[in-house]
Design a protein with these regions (language model features):
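NTP/phosphate- and nucleic-acid-binding module
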Residues: 1-376
């Protein structure tokens, strides 16, 4: 328990000036401090570059939409209680809601042009800010928040492309976990519908059973151990959830990949096949790394603040042995920064031992002690 307390991101993240919270701003609305912003920017650059290498194209879509959009998607009927609604349908001409997901917006990017079967698959990616009206009792640090950033994306594919593209999404998620050094810390779940609670879902039993069978077969072919969780599917399709536990043993979903054979019809999405006929595509909803805030919390606890160097807010601290070498230390700092290294100089009139101890407490991976020998 003591080790869990030491690693708890809600405590350590504040100590390391990664994030903070303020009562007058509200629960589930953390302020990301400069150190945390550096880490999130590094993660975002890496993820977006990797998605680009894998054929994703970027979109930038609004943070809100009229209720009409969510009525088409089904979210108004199945997820309204989890949304921040702006206005009253009984009194206002138009009612808006902050978006809890990006999918319907990217569908209209797709619908803005006519597509041939040769154009597919189309892989849309967006670093999205989303809003979900979580219960106040669920709020915790960075793992459960009301506004968050996510590496979201949607693949529009032909039915014959679905299995390959779904497997590729799993491969991308596994690559991200591997780079972050956490691939051994996750569990895989096939989240299924609950046929005894039909009102929670759209579509018929045959579609649900078929899509669940496809995902089950893929996971088995990839030799991925998984559990099957009834009632955990999205209302429009089953999914693979990749989960991890925090230091206290509570499990959270980090990455989700969903099979959707239904919403293309809701939005009248189609492509033209080789015979000139309209056909419905399938959709994959997926994240590469999931929610940035939750990933940050996970990494804080995983590494107890001793992050991989590429993620560290401060990578190098230059410590001159006396005031005489301050100018040289500043030159070293400038040279490091020119080469893209995040660094600082400790010019305080403190003892060397104190400065070194402070750098260690700040979890700076490298210290450069400079004096006459180094200047020569």
């Amino acid at each position: 328990m003591e080790e869990a307390k030491r690693r708890d991101h809600n405590k350590l993240g504040r100590e390391m000036k990664i994030f903070t919270t303020v009562d007058v701003i509200g629960q589930g609305l953390p302020l990301i401090m400069p150190n945390g912003v550096i880490m999130m920017q590094e993660l975002q650059r890496w993820i977006e570059d990797e998605e680009t290498k894998r054929g994703y194209i970027r979109t930038k879509t609004p943070l809100m939409a009229k209720s009409d959009l969510y009525k088409i998607s089904g979210h108004w009927d199945h997820y309204k209680e989890g949304m921040f609604v702006l206005g009253d349908e009984e009194t206002d001409k138009e009612v808006f809601a902050l978006r809890p997901m990006t999918c319907p917006f990217q569908y209209y990017v797709y619908k803005a042009e006519q597509h041939s079967y040769r154009d597919l698959p189309l892989r849309y990616g967006e670093t999205s800010t989303l809003f979900r009206n979580e219960d106040s009792g669920e709020m915790h640090g960075l793992t459960r928040v009301r506004q968050f950033t996510i590496s979201e994306g949607h693949l529009i594919v032909r039915p014959d492309q679905m299995v390959k593209e779904f497997k590729d999404c799993i491969a991308l998620a596994q690559y991200c976990l591997q780079v972050l050094g956490v691939e051994e810390d996750v569990t895989y779940h096939l989240s299924k519908w609950d046929p005894n609670n039909r009102e929670k879902y759209i579509g018929d039993a045959e579609v649900w059973n078929q899509t669940e069978a496809h995902i089950r077969q893929m996971l088995e072919e990839l030799n991925i151990p998984f559990t099957e969780d009834v009632g955990e599917a999205a209302f429009y399709g089953p999914k693979v959830d990749i989960n991890a536990k925090n230091v206290y043993g509570k499990e959270d979903t980090m990455i989700t990949i969903q099979w959707d054979a239904l919403l293309a019809e809701q939005f009248d999405m189609y492509y033209i096949d080789e015979n000139g006929e309209k056909q419905r595509p399938y959709i994959i909803h997926r994240t590469s790394m999931g929610c940035y805030e939750r990933t940050l919390a996970w990494l804080i606890e995983k590494y107890a603040g001793m992050f991989p160097t590429w993620l560290c807010p401060e990578q190098v601290r230059v410590i001159p042995i006396s005031e005489k070498f301050h100018n040289y230390a500043a030159k070293v700092e400038a040279q490091l920064k020119e080469n893209g290294i995040r660094c600082s100089v400790d010019q305080r009139s403190e003892k060397m031992g104190y400065k070194i101890r402070e750098a260690r407490l700040a979890r700076v991976p490298y210290m450069l002690i400079v004096g006459a020998k180094e200047e020569e």
